[in-house]
Amino acid sequence: MEKDDLTHFNDEKRAKMVDVTSKSETKRRAIASATIHMNEETLARIHAGKIAKGDVLAVAQVAGIMAAKKTSELIPMCHPIMTTKADISFEDDGKTALTITSEVVTVGKTGVEMEALTAVTIAALTIYDMCKAMDKGMRIEKTYLVEKTGGKSGTFKAEA
C-alpha cells in the first residue's frame, strides 16, 4: 500500500473514519498476545492468591474482555463493533513470564484486530496495577497480533 493509499485520511489529508458501508458482513476473528515479566515471587503469589488486591488473573481476564468491547472508545478511528466472542487466557513459564492471549470474534464489516490487541494490553496493565506494590520492575513486552481471519485481506499469521 502506498502512502497516498492510506484509508484513514480524507482528501484534505486529515483524519477520518473509513467508510465500511458497502463492505459485506463476514465472520472475523483475531488472536493477540502480550507477555508480562515479573519476579518469581510475584508470579508465585499470583498463583497462590496472595496478592492484596485480589484474584489477579480473574480481574485481568474481566478487564481484557471489557477492553475488547470498549476499543472504539479508546482508538479514535476504530469502528464500534458487535463483539460476539471475547476470551482471555493465561500461560506462564513457571518462573517469571506470564503470557496473555486474547481471542475476539465478530460477524461484521470490519476486523477485530484492535479489539484483540487492546484486550491483551489492558489485561497486562491490570496485572501490573494489581502487583505493582510488590514488583514495580514488571515489564510488558511482545504485544502483537498472532492471527486474524476473515474480511477482504484474508488470513494473517505472525511469523513464529
From Swiss-Prot:
Binding site for substrate: M77, C78, H79, M114, E115
InterPro entries linked to this entry: MoaC (IPR023045), MoaC_bact/euk (IPR047594), MoaC_sf (IPR036522), MoCo_biosynth_MoaA/MoaC (IPR050105), Mopterin_CF_biosynth-C_dom (IPR002820)
Enzyme superclass (EC): lyase
Reaction catalysed by this enzyme: (8S)-3',8-cyclo-7,8-dihydroguanosine 5'-triphosphate = cyclic pyranopterin phosphate + diphosphate
Domain of life: Bacteria
Alphabetized SUPFAM superfamilies for the sequence: Molybdenum cofactor biosynthesis protein C, MoaC
Pathway: Cofactor biosynthesis; molybdopterin biosynthesis
Database matches in Pfam families: MoaC (PF01967)
Role summary: Catalyzes the conversion of (8S)-3',8-cyclo-7,8-dihydroguanosine 5'-triphosphate to cyclic pyranopterin monophosphate (cPMP).
Name of the protein described by the UniProt record: Cyclic pyranopterin monophosphate synthase
UniProt lineage: Bacteria, Bacillati, Bacillota, Bacilli, Bacillales
